């Protein structure tokens, strides 16, 4: 997302003449590499600030006016939430999730209906480009980016060598997606993806995310108490969706787990692997 903002900023001399991603982090003004399509979809990370309590659903229909987003449809689906989850067991079993693990992960699970109010309210869709860019580029965030690059210099060296992806782009994604781990979200990924798999207008898409989240826990890559993130189920400092985690996450520190939440090495390398597999070309330049 930050890469898109930086590229768009190049076209506006009033706001960002000669804008370049490396200048944010004190590096030479040339960014190499292109990625197609851009990523969709965040050692130790700074402690996250306290988050406000999760609000209740407003009871209003979704802004999209989709038939599955009417207030009546949302209530009906919420009433059938447990039945919907039970119907997903055969799909989970095919992915290697045990019955015990499945039951444990859905035990007592209730839908987070507040998500229905958030589905069409993401800031990139509700703010102007420049207001949104102002949120992404600040002196504090730039300083934090430089600190991250210095703190993990050896890891960035190794990842650049292994994947050919520019460290400054990885650091920028880390900064945009979670402000360097300080804003990773505190919602249960299991609860969020289960809610969206059974309620609302994107059930087919989020069914895959929910099942993939169950697989992540079954493999032991991420601790259950660490699998927290955004209302949409993105988690970790560079905000992997569960299906993206399955495709791109790597165990770069060699501990047998692909932990993009707690391991800086896994986080940096997995983000680089995502870009590489999505078409990053080291020899190309832009900006």
Predicted regions and their residues:
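Bacterial N-terminal signal peptides
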Residues: 1-9
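Sec/Tat signal peptide C-region and signal peptidase I cleavage site
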Residues: 10-16
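Compositionally biased, proline/threonine/alanine/serine-rich low-complexity intrinsically disordered stretches
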Residues: 16-83, 100-103
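Acidic/histidine-rich, surface-exposed loop or edge segments in extracytoplasmic proteins
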Residues: 63-73, 85-88, 132-141
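Short acidic alpha-helix initiation/capping motifs at coil-to-helix transition points
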Residues: 79-88, 147-152
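Intrinsically disordered, low-complexity polar regions and short flexible loop motifs
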Residues: 92
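Catalytic glycan-binding domains that act on GlcNAc-containing polysaccharides
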Residues: 97-287
